[in-house]
Design a protein with these regions (language model features):
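Catalytic glycan-binding domains that act on GlcNAc-containing polysaccharides
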Residues: 1-169
Length: 169
């Protein structure tokens, strides 16, 4: 199944209008407003600390996981293992698998929670293991980086954008 999903990614065969229309709706906008209203303090704190627009972060979260309501059901260890043996992008996925195994071994992430996309992405913003390693943060200071928690996930996404050079308009 993983290889099948990899071969037929909608980003590569749908035109922009079709792709966007399938991923936007009045219902999704309402879900975004609900997330914003439920997390105003977090959103304002993150925007101030990282200087990243809330509109950008909320849009990304909406597209990636419908505001955390769909984070994927695939075992990402299995997905990355499978993809690492596929010759098309073996080096990339092998590297991601090795990073994930190190994160588990160093107890940075709990292997029992590793369900996400077919491609090995995880959490509310669908971070790949290398992104987790370099940019995920424990924003709520509970000694656990949990990318399925609004505080850690939202702040980690802002941290990622800031560190790769995103500049606020």
């Amino acid at each position: 199944k993983v290889i099948e999903y990899d071969r037929f990614q909608p980003e590569f065969y749908e035109d922009t209008k079709t792709y966007i229309s399938k991923r936007t709706s009045t219902k999704k906008v309402q879900k975004g407003l609900n997330f914003y209203n439920d997390n105003k303090s977090l959103i304002k704190n993150v925007e101030k600390k990282f200087d990243i627009e809330k509109e950008l972060l909320l849009s990304l979260m909406g597209i990636e996981t419908n505001y955390g309501t769909y984070v994927g059901k695939m075992d990402i260890l299995s997905s990355l293992s499978t993809l690492s043996f596929d010759e098309r992008r073996s080096e990339f996925f092998t590297n991601e698998l090795l990073i994930l195994l190190k994160l588990i071994d160093n107890e940075k992430i709990d292997y029992k929670t590793l369900y996400g996309s077919w491609a090995g992405a995880f959490g509310f913003f669908q971070f790949m293991p290398s992104t987790i390693k370099h940019y995920a943060i424990d924003f709520n200071k509970d000694k656990d980086i949990n990318l399925k928690d609004p505080e850690d996930a939202y702040a980690s996404a802002a941290n990622y954008l800031k560190k790769i050079g995103w500049k606020k308009n």
